[in-house]
Regions:
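Domain-scale signature associated with acetyltransferase and cell-envelope carbohydrate enzymes
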Residues: 1-129, 154, 158-160, 169, ...
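A short acidic, glycine-rich active-site loop
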Residues: 143-155
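Active-site/ligand-binding-proximal alpha/beta "capping" segment
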Residues: 174
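Short, flexible, mixed-charge acidic loops at enzyme active sites
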Residues: 133-143
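Conserved coupling/switch loop of ABC ATPases
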Residues: 171, 189
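A generic "structured core" feature
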Residues: 162, 180-182, 186
Length: 211
């Protein structure tokens, strides 16, 4: 082995041994979960008493509030995006208390998104108020990644809503209190309160309660 490389390797081994046995390493290992939780909480506008599982992805989390007692499971993505025309991020995502957001769920907004109390989602759910570009010929001639991201309408979800695995909530819709969204559904229009909906696009399967 090259003498210089050997010297570098020996130095690295000594440094690694020192760090592994140091008080700093032991402290970080003992407190890694607490430090991870605190790091994420400080990113958000509000996130007191929220449980974050591993590998949470955020963007501009200062525009996002998460209510007390909520739980974001592994690999949840939650992002707020700036207005590409003004350069200002005036997005506002509010998730009320008691939300339980399933693994790999993606919540994203450029405008205002309000999610009521006690939301329950399955895995791989998408909730979005935006899309890449529009359907004009000029935009369609661009690569999708180069089309300007724009909000298509605010999303509002009421209290005690249950959204099944792999459902997609598209821009501009309101979902009423107590609604149940079946797995694999695509929500393109408003959903009545206390109804069960499913399909692509969704239709009302059952009305559970008359308002």
């Amino acid at each position: 082995m090259n003498p210089i490389r050997k010297e570098i390797l020996n130095f690295y081994i000594k440094l690694n041994n020192w760090y592994t046995n140091s008080w700093l390493c032991k402290f970080l290992l003992r407190n890694k979960d607490y430090l991870y939780q605190e790091m994420l909480r400080r990113k958000f506008c509000q996130a007191e008493n929220v449980i974050f599982d591993s590998d949470i992805v955020t963007h501009d989390a200062h525009c996002i509030s998460i209510g007390q007692g909520s739980h974001l499971h592994h690999h949840v993505i939650i992002t707020a995006w700036r207005n590409h025309h003004t350069g200002i991020n005036d997005a506002n995502i509010v998730i009320e208390e008691g939300a339980d957001i399933g693994e790999y769920t993606h919540i994203t907004a450029m405008g205002h998104m309000h999610i009521g109390k006690n939301l329950l989602t399955g895995r791989w759910v998408t909730i979005t108020d935006n899309g890449h570009g529009d359907t004009s010929l000029i935009e369609l001639q661009k690569a999708p990644i180069n089309r300007v991201l724009s909000s298509k309408g605010n999303v509002t979800i009421g209290d005690n809503v249950w959204i099944g695995d792999k459902a997609t909530i598209l821009p501009g819709v309101t979902i009423g209190d107590g609604a149940v969204i079946a797995a694999n559904s695509v929500v393109t229009k408003d959903v009545p309160a206390y109804s069960v909906v499913g399909g692509n696009p969704v239709r009302v399967i059952k009305q559970l309660k008359t308002i």
